[in-house]
Amino acid sequence: MPLLSFWKSNRDEVLKMTVEQVVSSAGDGHLRDGSEASKEFRGYLRVCPSESLFNYARYCLENSFDKSGIILQDIVNELGRRLDFEVEDGLYQGKKTVVGFDGIWRSKSDPDILVEVKTTDYIAVSLDRIAEYKERLYAERRIEPNASMLVVVGREDTGALEAQVRGSRYAWDMRLISVERLIKLVQIKEKSDDPTTLTQIRQLLRPFEYTKIDRIIDVIFTTAVDVEQQIAEHPPVEEGDKEHGTFKQDRTDPDLLSAKRVEAVEAFARAKGKELVRYSRTLFWSADKTFRVCCAVSKRYEGDYQPYWYAFHPNWDRFLGEGKDSYFLLSCMDRAEAYAVPYSVLDKNKKSLNMTDRNDRSYWHVALTTMEDGSLAINLSRIGKKLALKPFAFGWSAATKAP
């Protein structure tokens, strides 16, 4: 059975496999350039959870086995995709007539990055050879002349390689990063919903004053976690709601919110027959980026008039708007169901929602209210109407049909 078919029918079993076992289940089990095994393995990496990618990378570094280097190469390139780069996979085995690069990471707003992956720096790295790859790729018009070079190394103790880069003529064109810190960058991106985070990450990967960027990433990672733990959105009282009382401002554990979000997204993906990967804290998409989901979670507030409240941010709006089939998922902490509002419906009704618009931040208010029959609806506060959510409801059963 092809690996992706096995994944769809036996997800839990695949997640228990080591990366060696996963590769052996792909095609004939031997990764070669242009092989079916390579196609299946790379296809699987596109849809597997980020946490599995992290574990696979660490397995390659902690265990000695055949082809660990080329497996790590594919994993590192997938980490690049999780950072929203357009990635061109390189060759497993170099050829005289073909440039033997490991990967090219591209983005619309930043220079290209030529990536070289090394499991260790015990073996001398030829900086001249990497630079030659860059020159040949530019001659073939496959990268821009201002492209930089990034060496991704398995070991964190890379002092000798750092000194080699600093003392070379490539000091301002090349940077180093360990696999573990590349993993941290993906974690930072997936914990954040701030679009500037991705911009900052890309700037870190480009040449600047420091040769190795691990310590800077550590600081950013710690800061991001601290900020996330302090975040608590408090809903404003909507117009016309003041007579129904105020809200008790109790914070909900971020881990509980995250678990509920994943629960809702996975249930919706199953019902739709889709494989979704995390783009950021609340955003998810398919490997081809056409199917997109934004999932917000609300605790249960006191009173029935406005029991749930969500902020809908402009960057979420852009993300969903750029997809072909997009949904805004409204999940409730105390319910085993959620509501998948098609983006077309939300976009049509945004103008009827209250909005906070400040210089530093803006967002629409998505306040849920209770209907006479006990079901929920979005309160279209500006026009005094309600958008019933019952047509968009789905439960946690895998057999449940999504709207």
Q: What residue spans do the PLM features occupy?
A:
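Interdomain/boundary linker segments immediately adjacent to catalytic/signaling cores
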Residues: 1-70, 226-252
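Catalytic core segments in nucleotide and nucleic-acid processing enzymes
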Residues: 65-70, 74-225
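Short acidic loop-to-beta-strand element that houses the catalytic metal-binding Asp/Glu
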Residues: 99-106, 278-294
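Active-site-adjacent loop/helix micro-motif of nuclease/hydrolase catalytic cores
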Residues: 121-132, 159-162, 299-321, 338-341, ...
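Non-catalytic C-terminal interaction segments of nucleic acid-processing enzymes
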Residues: 175-272, 279, 339, 344-403
